[in-house]
């Protein structure tokens, strides 16, 4: 359901609602006019700085560049997450909210691979991300995950992924309550994060925090905390499990695939201090090497997981860097 690329002001909720009415009446019907007005002042969150443009001290420009140049780098994890919505989104008018949607990556991957038929509304608290999403054909609305501008019982799925730890710990339970509020009966909430002490937690602490301009000191969730939030929100049926959510880059040679992974990581996390120290190519090689050292673990089934190369069906080399992630799935 690829939409036309548009220039829409990421700070202007009225402009976003108007554009949404034009490109997708289905998504526009999900918006709550009262909340659009009363929640506008609370729409911005702390990720405004992290995911703003570099001119304001953020890493938003590099983040968007990473997703644009390597659109499929996180496709395996996105495929697994969207698959968890199951029958809830298998009807002609299904809608999924992507609460931390950034520049619309989940929708764009879904459009590319045809993973689910539901229409995805990208949501984010950073105006720069909302503008970027519209510019790349992903309809988007500026809103905090804990203060949605969406009607009660109006959507079939809610995804909270790839940034859950950015939400202040005291407000995370409120996100689960908001997700349940906007879901129809039988709708599904999928909550994803990287466990405390996981390789991703180590990556943020040892690489992103010291080598990015924004730092990265956000407490991650645990299996128990995810379950507690889902139960407290009133979900009667839920489960928490682990998936492998890899980075994957492809190229004609093994070394090029590896360096593309390093470039992707350098852009994705805004590792500007590594670039200043080592230069762009040196920073890419360094980031790939650190990923090889950090992303080594044993899955919940007891299987060792390590970075590896694979041949693709068209003769390219794929470089896979596995990441364990926790996922809570709850049905209203």
How would you name each of these model-derived features?
Residues 5-36, 237-332:
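Conserved Class I S-adenosyl-L-methionine
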Residues 2-92, 105-109, 129, 190-213:
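Conserved class I S-adenosyl-L-methionine
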Residues 218-234:
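Short alpha-helix
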Residues 97-147:
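Class I SAM-dependent methyltransferase SAM/SAH-binding core
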Residues 162-166:
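Short catalytic micro-motifs in class I SAM-dependent methyltransferases
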Residues 173-188:
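A short glycine-rich, Lys/Arg-flanked "PGG" loop and its adjoining helix->strand segment in the class I
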Residues 159:
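A conserved beta-strand element that flanks and buttresses the S-adenosyl-L-methionine
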